[in-house]
Protein backbone atom coordinates (compact mmCIF):
# COMPACT_ATOMS: atom_id res chain seq x y z
CA UNK A 1 0.00 0.00 0.00
CA UNK A 2 1.29 3.44 -0.94
CA UNK A 3 1.06 6.18 1.67
CA UNK A 4 0.31 9.83 0.89
CA UNK A 5 3.99 10.85 0.93
CA UNK A 6 4.83 8.12 -1.59
CA UNK A 7 1.87 9.10 -3.77
CA UNK A 8 3.05 12.72 -3.84
CA UNK A 9 6.56 11.53 -4.65
CA UNK A 10 5.24 9.48 -7.59
CA UNK A 11 3.36 12.52 -8.93
CA UNK A 12 6.50 14.65 -8.51
CA UNK A 13 8.55 11.94 -10.28
CA UNK A 14 6.15 11.95 -13.22
CA UNK A 15 6.29 15.75 -13.42
CA UNK A 16 10.10 15.73 -13.16
CA UNK A 17 10.08 13.29 -16.08
CA UNK A 18 8.32 16.03 -18.10
CA UNK A 19 11.62 17.95 -18.23
CA UNK A 20 12.88 17.08 -21.70
CA UNK A 21 16.60 17.81 -22.06
CA UNK A 22 16.45 17.89 -25.86
CA UNK A 23 13.70 20.50 -25.83
CA UNK A 24 15.52 22.72 -23.32
CA UNK A 25 18.87 22.48 -25.12
CA UNK A 26 17.50 23.25 -28.59
CA UNK A 27 15.39 26.16 -27.31
CA UNK A 28 18.41 27.56 -25.48
CA UNK A 29 21.06 26.99 -28.17
CA UNK A 30 19.07 27.28 -31.42
CA UNK A 31 15.70 28.79 -30.44
CA UNK A 32 13.89 25.90 -32.16
CA UNK A 33 11.73 23.03 -30.97
CA UNK A 34 13.49 19.68 -31.51
CA UNK A 35 10.06 18.15 -32.05
CA UNK A 36 10.01 20.04 -35.37
CA UNK A 37 13.45 18.75 -36.40
CA UNK A 38 14.64 15.39 -37.73
CA UNK A 39 12.40 12.54 -36.57
CA UNK A 40 10.49 14.90 -34.28
CA UNK A 41 11.43 12.91 -31.21
CA UNK A 42 12.78 14.96 -28.27
CA UNK A 43 15.44 12.43 -27.37
CA UNK A 44 19.17 11.84 -27.53
CA UNK A 45 19.16 9.91 -30.78
CA UNK A 46 17.34 12.63 -32.72
CA UNK A 47 19.59 15.28 -31.16
CA UNK A 48 22.62 13.35 -32.36
CA UNK A 49 21.22 13.01 -35.87
CA UNK A 50 20.26 16.67 -36.16
CA UNK A 51 23.03 18.46 -34.23
CA UNK A 52 25.86 15.94 -33.75
CA UNK A 53 27.49 13.74 -31.13
CA UNK A 54 27.95 16.46 -28.51
CA UNK A 55 24.21 17.10 -28.45
CA UNK A 56 23.55 13.37 -28.26
CA UNK A 57 25.82 13.08 -25.22
CA UNK A 58 24.37 16.17 -23.51
CA UNK A 59 20.80 14.97 -24.04
CA UNK A 60 21.57 11.40 -23.00
CA UNK A 61 23.28 12.58 -19.82
CA UNK A 62 20.54 15.09 -18.98
CA UNK A 63 17.77 12.51 -19.33
CA UNK A 64 19.79 9.78 -17.58
CA UNK A 65 20.59 12.09 -14.67
CA UNK A 66 16.88 12.90 -14.42
CA UNK A 67 16.09 9.21 -13.90
CA UNK A 68 19.00 8.76 -11.49
CA UNK A 69 17.98 11.75 -9.36
CA UNK A 70 14.41 10.54 -8.93
CA UNK A 71 15.42 6.98 -8.02
CA UNK A 72 18.30 8.10 -5.76
CA UNK A 73 16.07 10.41 -3.73
CA UNK A 74 13.43 7.68 -3.46
CA UNK A 75 16.12 5.23 -2.33
CA UNK A 76 17.15 7.63 0.42
CA UNK A 77 13.59 8.45 1.53
CA UNK A 78 11.80 5.13 1.16
CA UNK A 79 14.36 2.29 0.67
CA UNK A 80 11.74 -0.17 -0.66
CA UNK A 81 12.86 -1.73 -3.96
CA UNK A 82 9.29 -2.13 -5.21
CA UNK A 83 8.62 1.55 -4.62
CA UNK A 84 11.91 2.44 -6.31
CA UNK A 85 10.86 0.52 -9.41
CA UNK A 86 7.46 2.25 -9.29
CA UNK A 87 9.29 5.58 -9.08
CA UNK A 88 11.37 4.64 -12.12
CA UNK A 89 8.18 3.81 -13.98
CA UNK A 90 6.71 7.21 -13.02
CA UNK A 91 9.70 9.24 -14.23
CA UNK A 92 9.82 7.23 -17.49
CA UNK A 93 6.08 7.78 -18.00
CA UNK A 94 6.66 11.50 -17.46
CA UNK A 95 9.41 11.47 -20.06
CA UNK A 96 7.44 9.49 -22.65
CA UNK A 97 4.01 11.04 -22.04
CA UNK A 98 4.70 14.51 -20.61
CA UNK A 99 1.58 16.45 -19.75
CA UNK A 100 3.56 19.67 -20.31
CA UNK A 101 4.11 18.67 -23.95
CA UNK A 102 0.66 17.22 -24.65
CA UNK A 103 1.87 13.64 -24.23
CA UNK A 104 4.61 13.85 -26.88
CA UNK A 105 7.92 13.04 -25.24
CA UNK A 106 11.01 10.94 -25.77
CA UNK A 107 11.35 7.18 -25.90
CA UNK A 108 12.52 6.73 -22.32
CA UNK A 109 15.75 4.82 -22.82
CA UNK A 110 18.15 7.41 -21.37
CA UNK A 111 15.88 8.02 -18.37
CA UNK A 112 15.59 4.24 -17.89
CA UNK A 113 19.36 3.77 -17.96
CA UNK A 114 20.04 6.52 -15.42
CA UNK A 115 17.29 5.32 -13.12
CA UNK A 116 18.43 1.71 -13.39
CA UNK A 117 22.01 2.63 -12.44
CA UNK A 118 20.65 4.37 -9.33
CA UNK A 119 18.32 1.44 -8.61
CA UNK A 120 21.02 -1.26 -8.68
CA UNK A 121 24.38 -0.67 -10.30
CA UNK A 122 25.12 -4.44 -10.37
CA UNK A 123 22.07 -5.05 -12.55
CA UNK A 124 23.19 -2.13 -14.72
CA UNK A 125 26.69 -3.63 -15.07
CA UNK A 126 25.21 -7.03 -15.92
CA UNK A 127 23.10 -5.43 -18.63
CA UNK A 128 26.11 -3.51 -19.98
CA UNK A 129 27.85 -6.88 -20.40
CA UNK A 130 24.80 -8.27 -22.21
CA UNK A 131 24.75 -5.17 -24.43
CA UNK A 132 28.41 -5.54 -25.36
CA UNK A 133 27.90 -9.17 -26.34
CA UNK A 134 24.93 -8.32 -28.57
CA UNK A 135 26.66 -5.23 -29.95
CA UNK A 136 29.54 -7.43 -31.14
CA UNK A 137 27.01 -9.73 -32.82
CA UNK A 138 24.77 -7.09 -34.46
CA UNK A 139 27.25 -4.20 -34.95
CA UNK A 140 24.63 -1.58 -34.14
CA UNK A 141 22.92 0.03 -31.17
CA UNK A 142 19.18 -0.44 -31.62
CA UNK A 143 18.79 -4.24 -31.61
CA UNK A 144 21.39 -4.85 -28.88
CA UNK A 145 19.86 -2.07 -26.80
CA UNK A 146 16.33 -3.41 -27.02
CA UNK A 147 17.45 -7.01 -26.41
CA UNK A 148 19.43 -5.84 -23.37
CA UNK A 149 16.46 -3.93 -21.96
CA UNK A 150 14.31 -7.03 -22.41
CA UNK A 151 16.78 -8.96 -20.20
CA UNK A 152 15.99 -6.79 -17.15
CA UNK A 153 13.34 -9.11 -15.64
CA UNK A 154 15.76 -12.04 -15.79
CA UNK A 155 18.35 -9.93 -13.96
CA UNK A 156 15.74 -8.99 -11.36
CA UNK A 157 15.13 -12.69 -10.70
CA UNK A 158 18.86 -13.51 -10.67
CA UNK A 159 19.49 -10.75 -8.12
CA UNK A 160 16.60 -12.00 -5.93
CA UNK A 161 14.16 -9.10 -6.19
CA UNK A 162 10.54 -9.68 -5.24
CA UNK A 163 7.99 -10.84 -7.78
CA UNK A 164 6.16 -7.49 -7.53
CA UNK A 165 9.36 -5.56 -8.24
CA UNK A 166 10.11 -7.90 -11.15
CA UNK A 167 6.59 -7.44 -12.55
CA UNK A 168 7.06 -3.67 -12.39
CA UNK A 169 10.31 -4.09 -14.33
CA UNK A 170 8.34 -6.06 -16.94
CA UNK A 171 5.84 -3.19 -17.21
CA UNK A 172 8.72 -0.77 -17.79
CA UNK A 173 10.19 -3.03 -20.47
CA UNK A 174 6.84 -3.47 -22.22
CA UNK A 175 6.38 0.31 -22.21
CA UNK A 176 9.85 1.00 -23.61
CA UNK A 177 9.58 -1.73 -26.25
CA UNK A 178 6.14 -0.44 -27.25
CA UNK A 179 7.37 3.13 -27.63
CA UNK A 180 10.44 1.94 -29.58
CA UNK A 181 8.55 -0.52 -31.80
CA UNK A 182 9.10 1.23 -35.13
From Swiss-Prot:
State where the protein is found.
Cell membrane
Predominant subcellular localization, coarse grouping? membrane
Record membrane topology = Multi-pass membrane protein
Cellular component, GO annotation: plasma membrane
Q: Which InterPro entries match?
A: G3P_acylTferase_PlsY
Q: Report the transmembrane regions from the record.
A: 5-25, 54-74, 81-101, 117-137, 157-177
GO terms under biological process: phospholipid biosynthetic process
EC identifiers of the protein: 2.3.1.275
Keywords attached to this Swiss-Prot or TrEMBL record, sorted alphabetically, are: Cell membrane, Lipid biosynthesis, Lipid metabolism, Membrane, Phospholipid biosynthesis, Phospholipid metabolism, Transferase, Transmembrane, Transmembrane helix
Summarize the protein's role.
Catalyzes the transfer of an acyl group from acyl-phosphate (acyl-PO(4)) to glycerol-3-phosphate (G3P) to form lysophosphatidic acid (LPA). This enzyme utilizes acyl-phosphate as fatty acyl donor, but not acyl-CoA or acyl-ACP.
Subunit structure comment from the entry = Probably interacts with PlsX.
Family from the record: Belongs to the PlsY family.
Q: What is this protein called?
A: Glycerol-3-phosphate acyltransferase 1
Q: Which gene encodes it?
A: plsY1
